[in-house]
UniProtKB/Swiss-Prot annotation:
In the N-terminal section; belongs to the FGAMS family. Keywords: ATP-binding, Cytoplasm, Glutamine amidotransferase, Ligase, Magnesium, Metal-binding, Nucleotide-binding, Purine biosynthesis. It is an enzyme of class 6 (ligase). SUPFAM superfamilies: Class I glutamine amidotransferase-like (SSF52317), FGAM synthase PurL, linker domain (SSF109736), PurM C-terminal domain-like (SSF56042), PurM N-terminal domain-like (SSF55326), PurS-like (SSF82697). Mg(2+) binds at E718, N722, D884. It comes from the Bacteria. The active site is at C1135, H1260, E1262. PANTHER family: PHOSPHORIBOSYLFORMYLGLYCINAMIDINE SYNTHASE. It comes from Shigella boydii serotype 4 (strain Sb227). The lineage of its organism: Bacteria, Pseudomonadati, Pseudomonadota, Gammaproteobacteria, Enterobacterales. The gene is purL. This is Phosphoribosylformylglycinamidine synthase.
């Protein structure tokens, strides 16, 4: 039976206004819209009155419910029937944890009530199209129609393909019907194999074969034999990549054989809890570094949010599934798309060339895709610290004559680093009889055929198959699985995981054969033991679906009880679905139909399928010299600062958590003005050291339209000039991931790909001492469609994205582009050696040209000398600022440095030649360094020692003030206010934020950028940062116990434990499941801290589901009430823990006036480094800190204080319960965005109880307790940041 329960309003006023504006623009006479959530409960038994009241209370969250009956025509948007939304999975979990076992499933829809004039059927279809994503959702016209969401169907049996009766044609038909993308020779192979077996194949076997042998999974082109211009080539592409490892194997521990590559890390204290006692401690051991970069291009073109989200999720799983289990740590992301064409902000180079119906626009991709990727990283608890964004779409005369080149099929790049124990780097041995396990969520009828689908050019497959290959994301589930993997690797030698792979393209049909085959075993499986939420799925759908957040593992039979215990504690679902066999055979039994859908020797599936041969021709580029008529420097500057590749990326940065883990030493945002221009991302290796890891990206794809090899060399060069900004040492410490995107089969591209791989793998990397131990290829970067009567194609340029990773010697020595105005000199190191080529530059692009000669690596020895010289100068502390030259050339490099330093520049380019345009806008490799004037001679001497004397040019100095002036021989070449340039540079991000978020907030942030008087972040402390008030208490040897409380989805517990540990506490890991099952109680604890993250993925209101699982469980409720009423206890709630505790008001004495915390005014997750002031309050944790003003990490989507009315706010203030407020950079309490990131009245962001024993706050002091993890800080701070005082105050209070 189904119950319907009304929910809160679903759209804020500005979202409704945006919808109305869209309808008006489409000439649809819609006058008014009201939208509210509607909940549907599928019940297996009736609820009594108390249970019904409990369910109603559970589903009461967010803004107050509307009291009126809605007016207008109902359009009910729900998830597509036959799918289960991530919201449903998490909300159902909460209902069960609150004791409501009668609830089979909760689901949620949005009821839109549309008031409109008379609309035709076609117009109503337009309205519904605007309101839902057809890939994920459906529209009903009656609330009762939602019954279809819970419809159950009978299982369907396996289908046989009549190969023996119909011959080869049966396979050809199945290939089309199932979208298998099989090549002719593969059809021959299958016909031969099954004829030898003497039986017909089942659909599931063909599907499994197609996924396992798709280009996506098998990399056929990279393993192919090559004939170019009639000449047999000596090596495959992959062999040339492997050549880098054969030449420079130094520091590589694992390459080419696992889900990620591993290199040597540093010996540090890894901080985690003991399995038996739950007590956190440091464990001194090597933290080796793993690295991986994936792409998820096809799904992102079809449905950007889930496409990008599952792209990030899949890459995170690759990291976790490395060796015998590892820990993902920090991420990077990248996008290449066609022109944005923002309405009202179209740029002169953006022509509309059309696109196929089934893919979304570049603007849609960049509105939704980054949000999806960020949301997954945020909820999983991984900071996203690095990225790139390129737009390109043009009709150009390239290798193949005049044609359309661009990114209708986008690049969505997801990568990152993690850490792994030395003894877990290599996979274990799978014993015969080992249990084969699926860890993670249930099978669902989604994401079918992703591997084969992404191996086709967009436009080749059927639209229904595109639907089928879109996945959905549940990062909170992946977090639970990762917690299990963490518990396993933390056991060291007792780790129950023998072998692990993630489930990706092809689902279990790819993952399980890969697992057993890699372990030298076969496997027998039971189909019906696979967890499934949809009983009507066919065997093919159960075995081959790509439900995300799953891993496959081999676990020794005798360790299964331990594994079971770990999973139950973390509430991570798992199923034993088979066991490993001696015989290399794969069998899948179906208990329901008592038959065998799969019964194959492994070598038929993964054996010697036909090897590909590429027989291709070379084409020469046809670029024309740049036509300069009509190009002025002033006009060029404004255009280039508007080009998204160059323009400010704040809209892509602040949506992503950049402080979680407490180990982020360098994020994108630089300096007191928080400008997104960092050269590279840097993390600390642990919470107790200054060793670290660095990541940087290089890519220069448009250059490939003129010179394939140069484009590839520049990508490597740019990654190197970016990562050089931190202290790494020997260049052999740097390892690269190479992600290759090409339109295979397009005239000239295959030969170009070979040329590019050869340039990097055989020549440049070996010469530099660089290794490429990991990478990925996507070989179908073309889109076809019909535009009227014309057949059109959009082909991407050959695109190599290089991600560089390295161990860092000392993270404190990372250099940023932030200029200083002390007596200084700016030096350009020009690795272009005066070539100043303008082909395929930003300048050429914004004037709709390609040019002829591009930049290149001009001298490999000098590139190596450059890296070594910068490393020497970093180690000697001779550099004040550093920024590489890239897109936009020298002018953009200097401008970004001036933005970061909030200063002026007096530059002189006389020494760069007479061609001013080329001097300012060429994109040859190089960098600008800032040094003290007194050090200039010594620095130039170091550069000369490294063979760079002829590359160094003095180009002026940074000065106070707002003028950005470039001269040559006394003549002004360009002069503008730095603030004006800063505003131009910000206009793209402003327009994107206006479109996507609350436009009022976007306007306020943009306005702030034009204020030259803004002093930036600054610090005023009322206490001595170096005084340790806990020292006398630590000296007694007594360590009070703090319960570090977490719920499923919480992700900030480790850094929180570390902060309390440093202050003299014994930090104990306490999961809510420990309390609910009675394994642990709170009676032994002196302090309790509820940590940040996304408990239950923030469904049913941030922190509210967590709170209700306490309030609705009598024993646990009493336990919390007793703790809060006990004198001599302390409690802290941070972020999600703050939201949770604010919902426990009825249990916490003196908290009656506490507010609720609701959706940010921006309607967006906000990750900021914000200034707060400590106010006079009873809070025991903030004693002695009153009046201090200091920055703190902020990361939340629901942090806005909501009070009942003005009287409630006045009472909260007059009782002195406000503990922290947001202030602007002038020190004034503020409600203005983004200084106040959530719009809370009076800047309120922390409150306390009347006794001061319980304090809750939205910002994260635990993420910045170490100075090194602050995005910016005054130079005189030592190891401890000022927020360490909170934790020491706690220790002091407990005596």
């Amino acid at each position: 039976m189904m119950e319907i329960l009304r929910g809160s309003p679903a759209l804020s006023a500005f979202r409704i206004n945006k919808l109305l504006a869209r309808f008006q623009a489409a000439r649809l006479p819609v006058h008014n819209i009201y939208a509210e959530y509607v909940h549907f409960a599928d019940l297996n038994a009736p609820l009594n009155d108390d249970e019904h009241a409990q369910l109603e209370r559970l589903l009461k969250y967010g803004p107050a419910l509307a009291s009126h009956a809605p007016q207008g025509k109902l359009l009910l948007v729900t998830p597509r029937p036959g799918t289960i939304s991530p919201w449903s999975s998490k909300a159902t979990d909460i209902a069960h944890n609150c004791g409501l076992q009668q609830v089979n499933r909760l689901e949620r829809g949005v009821a839109y009530y549309i008031e409109a004039g008379t609309l035709t059927n076609e117009q109503w279809q337009q309205v519904t199209a605007e309101l839902h994503d057809r890939m994920m959702e459906t529209v009903f016209f009656d609330l009762d129609d939602a019954e279809q969401l819970f419809a159950h169907h009978q299982p369907t049996p396996v289908t046989s393909v009549d190969l023996l009766g119909q011959g080869r044609q049966a396979l050809i038909d199945a290939n089309l019907r199932l979208g298998l993308a099989l090549a002719e020779d593969e059809i021959d192979y299958l016909q031969d194999a099954f004829t030898k077996l003497g039986r017909n194949p089942n659909d599931i076997e063909l599907y499994m074969f197609a996924q396992a042998n798709s280009e996506h999974c098998r990399h056929k082109i990279f393993n192919a034999d090559w004939i170019i211009d009639g000449e047999q080539q000596p090596k495959s592409l992959f062999r040339m990549i492997k050549n880098t490892f054969e030449t420079t194997p130094d520091h590589v521990l694992s390459a080419y054989k696992d889900n990620a590559a591993v290199m040597e890390g540093s010996e540090v204290g890894r901080y985690f809890a003991d399995h038996e006692t739950g007590r956190y401690d440091f464990h001194q051991e090597p933290a080796h570094i793993l690295m991986k970069v994936e792409t998820h291009n096809h799904p992102t073109a079809i449905s950007p949010w889930p496409g990008a989200a599952t792209g990030s999720g899949g890459e995170i799983r690759d990291e976790g599934a490395t060796g015998r289990g590892a820990k993902p740590k920090a991420g990077l992301v990248g996008f290449s798309v066609s022109n944005l064409r923002i309405l009202g902000f179209e740029q002169p180079w953006e022509e509309d060339f059309g696109k196929p119906e089934r893919i979304v626009t570049a603007l849609d991709i960049m509105t939704e895709g980054p949000l999806g990727g960020a949301a997954f990283n945020n909820e999983f608890g991984r900071p996203a610290l690095n990225g790139y964004f390129r737009t390109y779409e043009e009709k150009v005369n390239s290798h193949n004559g005049e044609e359309l080149r661009g990114y209708h099929k986008p690049i969505m790049l997801a990568g990152g680093i993690g850490n792994i124990r030395a003894d877990h780097v290599q996979k274990g041995e799978i014993n015969v009889g080992a249990k084969l396990v699926v860890l993670g969520g249930p099978a669902m009828n989604i994401g079918l055929g992703g591997g084969a689908a992404s191996s086709m050019a967009s436009g080749q497959s059927d639209a229904d198959l595109d639907f089928a290959s879109v996945q959905r994301d549940n990062p909170e589930m992946e977090r639970r699985c990762q917690e299990v993997i963490d518990r396993c690797w933390q056991l060291g030698d007792a780790n129950p995981i023998l072998f692990i792979h993630d489930v990706g393209a092809g689902g279990l049909s790819n993952a399980m054969p890969e697992l057993v085959s890699d372990g030298g075993r076969g496997g027998k499986f039971e189909l019906r033991d696979i967890l499934s939420d949809e009983p009507g799925m066919s065997p093919l759908e159960i075995w081959c679906n790509e439900s995300q957040e799953r891993y496959v593992l081999a676990v020794a039979a005798d360790q299964l009880p331990l594994f079971d215990e770990l999973c139950k504690r973390e509430r991570a679902p798992y199923a034993v679905i088979g066991e490993a066999t001696e015989e290399l055979h794969l069998s899948l039994h179906d208990r329901h139909f008592d038959n065998q859908p799969i019964d194959l020797p492994l070598d038929v599936l993964l054996g010697k399928t036909p090897k590909m041969t590429r027989d291709v021709q070379t084409l020469k580029a046809k670029g024309d010299a740049l036509v300069r008529e009509g190009i002025t420097i002033a006009d060029a500057v404004k255009r280039i600062l508007h080009l998204p590749t160059v323009a400010e990326k704040t809209f892509l940065v602040t949506i992503g958590d950049r402080s979680v883990t407490g180990m982020v030493a360098r994020d994108q945002m630089v300096g007191p003005w928080q400008v997104p221009v960092a050269n590279c991302a840097v993390t600390t290796a642990s919470l107790d050291s200054y060793y670290g890891e660095a990541m940087a990206i290089g890519e220069r794809a448009p250059v490939a339209l003129l010179d394939f090899a140069a484009s590839a060399r520049l990508a490597v060069g740019e990654a190197l000039t970016n990562i050089a900004a931190t202290q790494i040492g020997d260049i052999k410490r740097i390892k690269l991931s190479a992600n290759w995107m090409a339109a295979a089969g397009h005239p000239g591209e295959d030969a170009g790909l070979y040329e590019a791989v050869k340039a990097v793998g055989e020549e440049l990397c070996p010469a530099l001492g660089l290794t490429i131990p990991v990478g990925k290829d996507s070989m179908s970067m073309k889109t076809r469609w019909q535009e009227g009567n014309e057949e059109r194609e959009m082909t991407s340029p050959l695109s190599l994205v290089i991600s560089a990773f390295a161990r860092v010697e000392d993270v404190r020595h990372t250099i940023t582009p932030q200029l200083s105005t002390e007596d200084n000199a700016l030096l350009l190191i020009d690795l272009g050696k005066g070539n100043n080529a303008l082909g395929a530059t930003a300048l050429a692009q914004v004037y709709r040209q390609l040019g002829d000669k591009p930049a290149d690596v001009r001298d490999v020895a000098q590139l190596k000398g450059f890296y070594d010289a910068i490393q020497a100068l970093v180690a000697q502390r001779k550099l004040l600022a550093y920024h590489d030259r890239s897109d936009g050339g020298l002018l953009v490099t200097l401008a970004e440095m001036a933005f970061a330093g909030h200063c002026g520049i007096n530059a002189d380019i006389a020494s760069l030649g007479d061609d001013r345009l080329a001097a300012l806008f060429n994109e040859e490799l190089g960098a600008v360094i800032q040094v003290r004037a007194a050090d200039r001679e010594a620095v130039e001497s170091v550069l000369a020692q490294h063979g760079l004397a002829d590359c160094v040019h003095y180009v002026g100095q940074a000065v106070s003030g707002d003028r950005f002036v470039i001269t040559a021989n006394g003549e002004t070449v360009f002069s503008e206010s730095r603030t004006t340039l800063r505003v131009w540079w910000a206009e793209t991000t402003w327009q994107m934020q206006r479109l996507r978020d609350n436009p009022e907030c976007a306007d306020q942030e943009h306005q702030a950028k034009s204020n030259d008087a803004d002093p930036g972040l600054n610090v005023k402390l009322s206490f001595d940062i170096n005084e340790d008030v806990a020292a006398p208490y630590i000296a007694t040897g007594a360590r009070p116990k703090v319960a570090v409380l977490r719920e499923q989805g919480v992700n900030s517990h480790v850094e929180m434990a570390a902060a309390f540990h440093r202050a003299g506490f014994d930090a104990i890991d306490v999961h809510m499941s420990d309390l609910l099952t009675g394994r642990t109680g709170l009676e032994d604890f002196h302090a309790l801290v509820a940590c940040g993250g996304f408990s239950y993925g923030d469904v049913l209101g941030a922190g509210e589901g967590w709170a209700k699982s306490i309030l609705f469980n009598d024993r646990v409720r009493d336990e919390f009430a007793t703790f809060f009423h006990r004198p001599q206890t302390l409690a802290l709630g941070v972020c999600n823990g703050c939201q949770m505790m604010s919902n426990l008001r009825e249990l916490i004495p003196g908290s009656e006036l506490w507010p609720r915390f609701v959706r940010n005014t921006s309607d967006r997750f906000e990750a900021r480094f914000s200034l707060v002031e400590v106010t006079q309050s009873p809070s025991l944790l903030l004693q002695g800190m009153v009046g201090s003003q200091m920055p703190i990490a902020v990361s939340h989507g629901e942090g806005r204080v909501e009070v009942r009315d003005a009287a409630h706010l006045a009472a909260l203030e007059s009782k002195g319960l406000v503990a922290l407020r947001y202030v602007d950079n002038f020190g004034k309490v503020t409600e203005t965005y983004p200084a106040n990131p959530n719009g809370s009245p009076n800047g309120i962001t922390a409150v306390t109880t009347e006794s001061g024993r319980v304090t809750i706050m939205m910002p994260h002091p635990e993420r910045v307790f170490r100075t090194v993890s602050n995005s910016w800080h005054p130079e005189n701070w030592g190891e401890d940041g000022p927020w360490m005082r909170i934790f020491r105050n706690a220790r002091k209070q407990l005596g």
